[in-house]
Amino acid sequence: MLRVRCLRGGSRGAEALHYIGSRLGRTVTGWVQRTFQSTQAATASSGNSCAADDKATDPLPKDCPVSSYNEWDPLEEVIVGRAENACVPPFTVEVKANTYEKYWPFYQKYGGHYFPKDHLKKAVAEIEEMCNILKMEGVTVRRPDPIDWSVKYKTPDFESTGLYGAMPRDILIVVGNEIIEAPMAWRARFFEYRAYRSIIKDYFRRGAKWTTAPKPTMADELYDQDYPIYSVEDRHKLAAQGKFVTTEFEPCFDAADFIRAGRDIFAQRSQVTNYMGIEWMRKHLAPDYRVHIISFKDPNPMHIDATFNIIGPGLVLSNPDRPCHQIDLFKKAGWTIVTPPIPVIPDDHPLWMSSKWLSMNVLMLDEKRVMVDANEVPIQKMFEKLGISTIKISIRNANSLGGGFHCWTCDVRRRGTLQSYFD
């Protein structure tokens, strides 16, 4: 049975960390192993500190606009992205490593230019409808500023055009009353934070914490310029060996490679998130939160929420095509593992930046309500069997830009408290 403990002082949950960390430590070496060891040591030492306990249990300001600890508490405020002016990223090595071969000619032809006009128009309409429905469900909706992403920019290390302000989940993560800007890893996303600054400054003035992770230079050394990509089999072998297009030259991560479950936050090493980036998050959030690395049989890992999506206390959707190597740890902790059905999105529908498994990239409005694609009947039935009501919207054209409901949003405020689901 899943055990849930509200954090009101006392134990810091070192036992739970030992349970997860010790087992994960057996499957990893080098940097990853040292990360878990240092996390365990930091947590254990904090258990003897009254000051640390006080810090962890300080109440948030009652009027703080930012407060979210997990993926399922009742949603009160959310940022929803924009498809307007979205541009195809230049076909650089990091973009090639994250996209399917059949779309490479598309990137080579249109890189630096807007996505197809008619497609963007449909995507914009879909997201507007999504915003309207969220408002009807009682959720406050914020939108990023519109920006012309076709403008070329240059740093001392590279030049590029932009991408979009469509996926706030990729760049922002809320932990408690703190909103963290991720540094990103694609050169086309270097200045993506600009679309969200007016919103974040407003939250900051109203009492939220605001942190920007160290911005990488994105110099050539951050990328394996000779990353060998010839087939899915090659990618499987490379991922199994812990080899990705991003190196450990400097910290980089996308916020969407982290998923929250109260005190415990799970992260994956991916094509856009390196161990240095995960280590930065671990150090930044310790001792109040515990960051754990998990991995999957995934030839092209990029963002965790279409592979492993936590939808309730002790309840997770686990992609059958990308099984989690550490899934037994969750089972032993009393979690329920749900395997979502195969997506029904047609083969000829363009998915320039993602896979069909966006069907499981859902947004929980609370434990009993989920926003799901209107076309994905099999997963709707799955949720209904779980006793979860479905709010159906079609965002197929918006999917083409690389995200489902979870990707298109960043939940800023959920009504709930910090709890531990592994103690």
From Swiss-Prot:
The active site is at 254, 303, 407 (amidino-cysteine intermediate). Transamidinase that catalyzes the transfer of the amidino group of L-arginine onto the amino moiety of acceptor metabolites such as glycine, beta-alanine, gamma-aminobutyric acid (GABA) and taurine yielding the corresponding guanidine derivatives. Catalyzes the rate-limiting step of creatine biosynthesis, namely the transfer of the amidino group from L-arginine to glycine to generate guanidinoacetate, which is then methylated by GAMT to form creatine. Provides creatine as a source for ATP generation in tissues with high energy demands, in particular skeletal muscle, heart and brain. Pathway: Amine and polyamine biosynthesis; creatine biosynthesis; creatine from L-arginine and glycine: step 1/2. SUPFAM superfamilies: Pentein (SSF55909). It catalyses: L-arginine + glycine = guanidinoacetate + L-ornithine; 4-aminobutanoate + L-arginine = 4-guanidinobutanoate + L-ornithine; beta-alanine + L-arginine = 3-guanidinopropanoate + L-ornithine; taurine + L-arginine = taurocyamine + L-ornithine. Homodimer. Its EC number is 2.1.4.1. This is Glycine amidinotransferase, mitochondrial. Belongs to the amidinotransferase family. It is an enzyme of class 2 (transferase). Arginine binds at residues 170, 305, 322, 354-355.
